Amino acid sequence: MTSGDTNTYDLIVVGSGFFGLTIAEQAASELGKRVLVVEKREHIGGNAYSEKEPETGIEVHKYGAHLFHTSNDRVWEYVNRFAEFTDYQHRVFAMHDGTAYQFPMGLGLINQFFGKYYSPDEAKALIEEQREGLDPAAATNLEERGIALIGKPLYDAFVKHYTAKQWQTDPTDLPPEIISRLPVRYTFNNRYFNDKYEGLPVDGYAAWLEKMASHELIDVHLDTDWFDVRDTIRGESPEAPVVYTGPLDRYFDYAEGRLGWRTLDFEQEVLDTGDFQGTPVMNYNDADVPYTRIHEFRHFHPERAEYPDDKTVIVKEYSRFAEDDDEVYYPINTPEDREMLKRYRELAAAESRENKVLFGGRLGTYQYLDMHMAIGAALSVFDNHVRTYFVDGKPIDQPRGH
């Protein structure tokens, strides 16, 4: 990162999450372009940012657990330019009716929940009986697909109430695609992710993100709201395209209405014990528990000998609808939202053509994107839209479906 000697830039990036930083880093390192990154928060990195809890020195993911995983060779090669990764493999347990169950859906959960051993074939037959004749491919909402995937008893115990808490929306009103991220296996493999590559940055997310932004041609302005400085910055760099990764509806001043987002609240505690729950993440699936899960961050880095033996940090996570002044995290994506999104995409396409603005990232495209997906999307947008603008002189145009 540099302080900069001039106010003229070749490219402006709004937001410093993985999408924005990937675009900025590639423009600087691959094209030699001078880039300004404008960030509303006091730190870079978006929701992936992490910091040490001062009393214990335990690294805490400030906006909830972030686990890096990908099967994309290009993405894995790219991120390894900026960070070394541990061999961490994510595993989750789920609390239901006072008992912690192995999760996600697999033979461990089935055998424990139903109180007897089922072989793979027996477990498949059991779930077939319990899916109520529903076909996952034909499901029209999350509840139908959930029952079709794991049967009604397991859906009711481990998905229904957790989903309602997480999204503040009835599962019958949520799209079926949301639950497609949930692994379903008929083995005792309890890894949460199936990807080829998985791990956590050895030195933490903050160090990784700062290295991405460290190129001498990149300037970062923190604590800066784009809408307060847009006219000034674009006036000083009138030819510079903008890559906007903030909320899509906010960019257009909610002209088509407010898209449905959810936000998260976090309750952090330092406890006088060396281990609170014995695992990094415990989901709380019952409706009478207000939080969705508890993170215990020491377990993400068991290799760190400097962590204290007599203290630990836990964070309870609560999910709710985002109100007007809240930070928005995830799109709810109801049918009404999807209709509104179509209209916003038309506005985005016009803005791209007329004012050289590209919309990207989770917030800028109203999509649920894991970290590797945001990075992969940014690399694609850079190759097919940013590079072609600077190298071939092609006009800026918004990617289809974004």
Question: Where does each model-flagged region fall?
Answer:
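Beta1/beta-strand and adjacent pyrophosphate-binding region of the FAD-binding site
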Residues: 4-19, 36
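Active-site/ligand-binding neighborhood in enzyme catalytic cores
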Residues: 97-102, 107-241
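C-terminal lid/capping helical subdomain adjacent to the catalytic/cofactor pocket in oxidative enzymes
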Residues: 223, 230-235, 257-271, 280, ...
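Glycine-rich FAD pyrophosphate-binding loop
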Residues: 12, 25-54
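Dinucleotide-binding Rossmann-like beta1-alpha1 core, especially the glycine-rich loop
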Residues: 55-132
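Short alpha-helical segment within the catalytic ATP-binding CA
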Residues: 22
